[in-house]
Design a protein with these regions (language model features):
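Positively charged n-region of N-terminal signal peptides that target proteins for export
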Residues: 2-4, 17-23
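C-terminal motif of bacterial Sec signal peptides marking the signal peptidase cleavage site
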Residues: 33-34
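Ankyrin repeat A-helix N-terminal signature
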Residues: 44-49, 77-83, 110-116, 141-145, ...
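Ankyrin repeat structural motif
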Residues: 50-58, 83-91, 116-124, 158-166
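Ankyrin repeat boundary/linker residues
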Residues: 68, 101, 134-136, 143, ...
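Leucine-rich solenoid repeat scaffolds
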Residues: 140-181
C-alpha cells in the first residue's frame, strides 16, 4: 500500500482507539437509559416511609407493580416494613397481591415474618393466596423446601397470623405436599 493510500485511509477512518472510545460511550449511554427505571422511585418512597410521594407517583401513573433487582414490588416492601397505609393505598391502586421476590416469597410471607398482622389480614381479605408456595434453599444443606405463609408463622412464632391463616384454609408446605399439591 502506498504512502498516499495509507494517508487517505487514515483521513477517512478515525484511529481505532477513538472508535472504541465512542463505542464504549454509546454502550454506556444505552445501558444507563435502558436501566433507569423511573418507577423505582415508587419503591424508594415506600422504603423511606414517604406516603405523600407514593400518592404523587401513583397519581402520575407510575407502575404500582414495578420491580427492583430483588423482584420486589412496592407492596412487598410495604408488607416487609409494616407500612399498613402504604399497603392499603397500593392495593387500592391495583397492586398484585401475589407478586414474588426473586426467592419466591410473597407479601403475605413478608407480613407474617415481620409481625405485620394488619397487613396479613388486609392481604387475606383482598384475596391473596393463603397457600402460595415459595421454594427456598437451605444454604447449609443445599436442600430446597416449600414454604407457605403458614410455615412462616411457625418460623416467626406469629400465633395471631397463624390463627388467621388457619381460619382461611392455609396449610403448611408439608400438608400441601401430602395432598399432592
Amino acid at each position: 500500500m502506498s504512502k498516499s493510500t495509507r494517508f487517505a485511509l487514515n483521513k477517512l477512518t478515525p484511529p481505532l482507539e477513538l472508535n472504541m472510545k465512542q463505542i464504549l460511550i454509546t454502550i454506556t449511554a444505552v445501558l444507563v437509559v435502558g436501566c433507569a427505571n423511573q418507577d423505582i422511585k415508587l419503591i424508594q418512597a415506600v422504603q423511606d416511609g414517604n406516603l405523600e410521594a407514593v400518592e404523587k407517583y401513583l397519581a402520575a401513573g407510575m407502575d404500582v407493580n414495578t420491580k427492583d433487582g430483588y423482584g420486589a414490588t412496592p407492596l412487598l416492601y410495604a408488607a416487609e416494613y409494616g407500612r399498613n397505609d402504604f399497603a392499603e393505598l397500593l392495593i387500592t391502586n391495583g397492586a398484585d397481591l401475589n407478586a414474588r421476590y426473586n426467592d419466591g416469597l410473597t407479601a403475605l410471607h413478608a407480613a407474617v415474618l415481620n409481625g405485620s398482622n394488619e397487613i396479613v389480614k388486609l392481604l387475606i381479605d383482598q384475596g391473596a393466596d393463603v397457600n402460595t408456595k415459595a421454594k427456598l434453599k437451605n444454604f447449609l444443606t443445599s436442600k430446597t423446601h416449600i414454604s407457605t405463609p403458614l410455615d412462616s408463622t411457625i418460623v416467626s412464632h406469629n400465633n395471631i397470623a397463624h390463627d388467621l391463616l388457619r381460619k382461611h384454609g392455609a396449610k403448611t408446605g408439608e400438608e400441601l405436599k401430602a395432598e399432592g399439591k
